[in-house]
Amino acid sequence: MEDFLWVEKYRPHKIADCILPEEYKSTFQSYVDRKEIPHLLLCGGPGTGKTTVARALCDEIGCDYLMINGSDESGIDTFRTKIKNYASTISMTGGKKVIIIDEADYLNPNSTQPAMRAAMEEFAHNCTFIMTCNYKSRIIEPLHSRCAVIEFKLRKEDKPKMAMAFMKRASEILTAEKVPFDRSVLAEVVKKHFPDYRRVLNELQRYSVSGKIDTGILASVADVSINELVSSLKEQNFSAMRKWVAENGSEDPVRLYRKIYDSLYDVMDKSSIPNAVVLLAKY
């Protein structure tokens, strides 16, 4: 199944091959060069490369690692069984083991996350923890303080370079898969979903079933803008808001939440932003 999915088939196994701003890449490369990974909390939107980087670090250094999806296994039983059992045993290679917890912001903040804090101290000699999350506000502060926190957030000046790098990578993948493509259409797909690299590849693979990536798919590529939603909310026009939700209900909800989250500083008073973040975190 993994080989069938392009996101897995073409997943980078080295930090040098990951599409990241240079400042992030140099930080992760320094871990590889030292062959030592600290506890990490990688934060950012879906598909921005957090899990890819975590796995590439382990692959390149040669660490044994365990993958856990926090959204599927969020309860304390996961800690008592998988996490604690794995962290307490010695690596077959003699080096440190790594536990990668994907979507750690879904771990129970009242039971599993506090237990994680104790485990990070108890097994520090034997095991490193790498957590990824979409919203760092959902991670308790004691875990923040025990990790190097790295936010996968692109600066304005980095966006064109990263988009071009992924455009090049997507072109190489389509060529390798022998899928004919129109470069202008590919650019539209990248533009719509950037910086969600995973979504771009999944969409390209879905569109490729027709045999090619050309103007025939453009009707499906139209981007979702939240400007109309924001205007409706400001005007308290709840009829228009319900209409917007009905028209865009098929979109990925996490992606929509992320768009709203990223726009807060542009559309809200600064004093209201903390309450909005807490409200979004509930969903």
Language model regions located:
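P-loop/Walker A NTP-binding region and its immediately flanking N-terminal helices
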Residues: 1-156, 205
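AAA+ P-loop NTPase domains with strong preference for DNA replication initiators
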Residues: 22, 164-283
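Short amphipathic alpha-helix in the helical subdomain of ABC transporter nucleotide-binding domains
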Residues: 72, 79, 159, 163-166, ...
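The catalytic "switch" region of P-loop NTPases
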Residues: 142-176
